Regions:
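Patatin-like phospholipase
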Residues: 1-223
Length: 223
């Protein structure tokens, strides 16, 4: 759908948000998913319908790279939408996080793939939220409900709560910091750099473990 005014966009997103409270399938009546990717990866595991959203597939080209990149970060109601991306369906494009916030896809389909049975999912938190509008709906998290099997073969790699508590303000940096620090840019930047340095040490420790695994660091899973 292509709203013709800011008011139409606001009304449309209000309707979509209310629909999402009831069901993601109801949200799918308002928004389609468009996947723009490398022609060398057919994404066959995503081609069979897996949720209520109509999914379109398009090839990434030199003509649509920039508008697709812009659309992927275009926040609804804050930024002007992107329209007419070459090689894609006509319509109005916004940040795909509205429906695919943390990419809660049917990774279990890859179990029969020649690429391997396990999916490594580096993440910034210990749970996967399907859509941005689902952030306040914990029952929508991946691993729960009728689609819980989607992540049976996923290894979720995320910072531990203990690590996060060591960071400035005991949290990961995010856009809310701009409001918290206000015009105190020096403190915000200093704390961000501290968090980045600590994260780099965590990265290096993980890389060292991958290169030379230390089984004494492994905690068995109890099923």
């Amino acid at each position: 759908h292509t709203p013709q005014s800011a008011l139409a966009s606001k009304l449309g997103f209000t309707a979509a948000a209310l629909a999402n409270i009831a069901s993601r399938d109801y949200l799918a009546r308002h928004i389609d998913r468009v996947v723009i990717g490398d022609r060398r990866d057919a994404l066959l595991w995503m081609k069979d319908k897996f949720d209520g959203f109509k999914t379109h597939f398009a090839t990434l080209t030199t003509d649509n790279l920039l508008p697709a990149l812009l659309a992927s970060g275009t926040l609804p109601l804050i930024m002007q939408p992107v329209r007419h991306i070459p090689g894609t369906p006509d319509g109005t494009y916004w940040d795909g996080g509205i429906i695919d916030y943390h990419l809660a896809f049917p990774y279990s389909r890859l179990n029969n793939s020649t690429q391997g049975n396990l999916v490594l999912y580096p993440h910034f938190t210990d749970h996967i939220i399907p859509g941005w509008l689902d952030k306040a709906l914990p029952w929508r998290r991946a691993g729960t409900g009728t689609h819980s099997h989607w992540i049976d073969n996923v290894i979720l790699l995320s910072p531990s709560p203990a690590f996060v508590r060591t960071l400035p303000r005991a949290k990961l940096p995010d856009r809310k910091d701009f409001f918290y620090y206000g015009v105190n840019h020096d403190e915000r930047i200093r704390n961000w750099k501290i968090a980045m340095a600590d994260s780099e040490r965590m990265r290096d420790a993980f890389a060292a473990f991958v290169a030379k695994p230390d089984l004494s660091q492994i905690i068995p899973l109890n099923f």
